[in-house]
């Protein structure tokens, strides 16, 4: 720790000595530069001051720095040229003539200036002069109006002759009435559910199965399948009594009986006809299973795959013909 302190003291002393040496060297160098840059006039004045120390000087005190000496304007010696030039110009007769002509011109201009000052008499003389063009202009306007009155009937006649009224006959356009497309002939697809033996369907069991499959009793005293299972919306297909009179009207379901029921849908129908047919076929098969009956075609023959294919082909042909 003592050695480090000693080293720091030595380094600080060396740094201070270096700064002092650099300051002395810089001040000495600047003093030489100032002496070398002094003008000759400054050196002469300093020499005279040394020769006559006791005499008073009339010029101003020395400036604070050398830059003020440099900024002062140096007076160059004229070597006696000013007096010679003045004498030459003063004795030249050409210059005297030019100066005299210039003075005469200035005097003439001063004399001519009052001619431009307007007086009351001048205004009185100018007014009649201005009134004459106004009268002439008014006379010209009156003459122009007279010419217009004389020319006006000349131009009216040709214009009336050149602009005959052209009557445009209204164009009658017969409205194009599009012929309404003929409504397609309605077709009916029929499926039947018939009892398997001689025992008929009892109303209690039959109506319960129909209601469970989304059929609702409604108009014409038959059951319908609507778009909405709550009984709202369009009817997709309907179910009627296979026997006369064709209705499923009943007071007490237990007292109602029938040999079979008929499912039917019309073409065209609401929605997709092929989907409606598939739904009707599925419900008919479900009720036949519940009641132990059979699914028959429109001719009351057992349903076969070929007969189902013919039903679907009928739907496709109907849609193609009425597309």
Curated annotation (Swiss-Prot):
Membrane-topology descriptor: Single-pass type I membrane protein
Span list, region Disordered: 35-92
Regions of this protein lying in the Cytoplasmic compartment: 27-323
Keywords for the protein's UniProt record, in alphabetical order: Cell cycle, Cell division, Cell inner membrane, Cell membrane, Membrane, Transmembrane, Transmembrane helix
Gene Ontology, cellular component aspect: cell division site; plasma membrane
Biological process according to GO: division septum assembly; FtsZ-dependent cytokinesis
Basic and acidic residues biased stretches: 41-60, 68-78
SUPFAM superfamilies (alphabetical): Cell-division protein ZipA, C-terminal domain (SSF64383)
Periplasmic side: 1-5
Disulphide linkage map: none
Location in the cell: Cell inner membrane
Chain segments annotated as transmembrane: 6-26
Subunit and partners: Interacts with FtsZ via their C-terminal domains.
NCBIfam families: septum_zipA
Family the UniProt entry places it in: Belongs to the ZipA family.
Function: Essential cell division protein that stabilizes the FtsZ protofilaments by cross-linking them and that serves as a cytoplasmic membrane anchor for the Z ring. Also required for the recruitment to the septal ring of downstream cell division proteins.
Protein's name in the database: Cell division protein ZipA
Organism: Vibrio campbellii (strain ATCC BAA-1116)
Lineage summary: Bacteria, Pseudomonadati, Pseudomonadota, Gammaproteobacteria, Vibrionales
Gene: zipA
